[in-house]
Design a protein with these regions (language model features):
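C-terminal helical "lid" subdomain and adjoining coupling/linker elements of P-loop NTPases
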Residues: 164, 168-175, 186-194
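Intrinsically disordered, low-complexity regulatory segments
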Residues: 1-151, 160, 181
Length: 194
């Protein structure tokens, strides 16, 4: 976990908690917000589908099994500890479906039960951060579910197809929801040129 001046006061009652993805953003945003806020970095995704298993059940409403990644355990523990004493919690992960899903996974992994607010900014400037904190919102579950769908399709289609390619075509081969259609487009274009 990246350290900054506000993190040294971790656990002080009354300090609002802000969670961003990167340590660099944490340092910059911490300067903008001041000592009333503790800004921590999640370092990106904190949970994922386990390796070596599909971990998504299409027969049970696509229920997925997520686990905290080994590298994220200390980060999750630090966030969990900071959240206990924070009067307010703001999730300021990136403004896209991945960031929205990271925010949701942070709540689940750190077992945060108190209300949280989602703040979104598209640039790391004092004005943009102030504007975001003036207009907090809830986590957008439509974006979270869009990321889940993308991740689940990767696992349900790309994972077994890649295994077959490696077994029967060439070691190191892979397939996926983006690269397979892109490869088809390249092949079709090559055929047109010929």
């Amino acid at each position: 976990m990246e350290s900054n001046d506000n993190q040294k006061t971790s656990g002080l009652t009354g300090q609002k908690l802000v969670i961003v993805e990167s340590p660099t953003k944490a340092r910059t945003i911490s300067r903008f917000l001041g000592n009333d806020f503790q800004v921590l970095a999640s370092m990106g995704h904190v949970r994922d589908l386990p390796d070596r298993r599909i971990s998504v059940d299409p027969e049970d409403e696509f229920k997925a099994i997520y686990q905290i990644t080994p590298t994220a355990k200390p980060v999750v523990n630090a966030i969990k500890a900071a959240a206990k004493n924070a009067p307010e919690i703001y999730l300021a992960t990136d403004p896209d479906r991945e960031g929205e899903a990271i925010a949701w996974h942070l709540l689940e992994a750190a077992e945060i039960k108190k209300p949280v607010q989602r703040v979104v900014f598209h640039s790391i400037t004092e004005n943009a951060v102030d504007e975001a904190f003036a207009h907090p919102r809830e986590i957008d579950m439509r974006l979270v579910n869009a990321q889940f769908a993308r991740r689940h399709i990767d696992r349900l289609i790309g994972y077994p197809t890649s295994n077959l390619l490696r077994r029967y075509v060439q070691k190191g081969s892979s397939a996926g929801r983006v690269q397979s259609p892109a490869l088809r487009m390249v092949v079709e274009r090559e055929e047109e040129i010929r």
